[in-house]
Amino acid sequence: ISNWNNLYGKNGFIQIQILITEKNFEEVICKTLEFFQKKKQFSFLTTLKELGIGNENYLSFPSKGYTLTLDLKMNSNLKTIYEEFELLLAQYKTKVYLTKDSFMSKKYFEDTYKKLNKFKEIKNKYDPLNVIKSFQSRRLGL
């Protein structure tokens, strides 16, 4: 579909990509889709991918399981809706992909990225004045 991204209007869209373990992926997928349906947030493009074993990088996302990605129209309610969605994700220890993150809380990030402290040690060594930063790094405490 040509120019499919224009379906979301002038404010565009965000992507949410979550990592779901094999043991509860069907339940998490159903609960996720039901959650956004109840909130009247519809994804024109939703993808499901199977992942293999991840790597040892400090902020690595991949791990054995599945990813579910949703494209959601940006609107004034989406941040609040996401905060509620994060509570659902926490029940399943589901990881959110940093590259596609727009709203993840600092606490959720700290709870799900287990090697975060090692990353911070290295960043502090090479950037002690915290010159290298972004909106996301400020929000997540990097």
Go through the PLM ranges and name each one.
Residues I1-D111:
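Substrate-recognition/cap regions that form aromatic- and gly/pro-loop-enriched pockets
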Residues A90-L142:
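Activity-critical C-terminal alpha-helical subdomain
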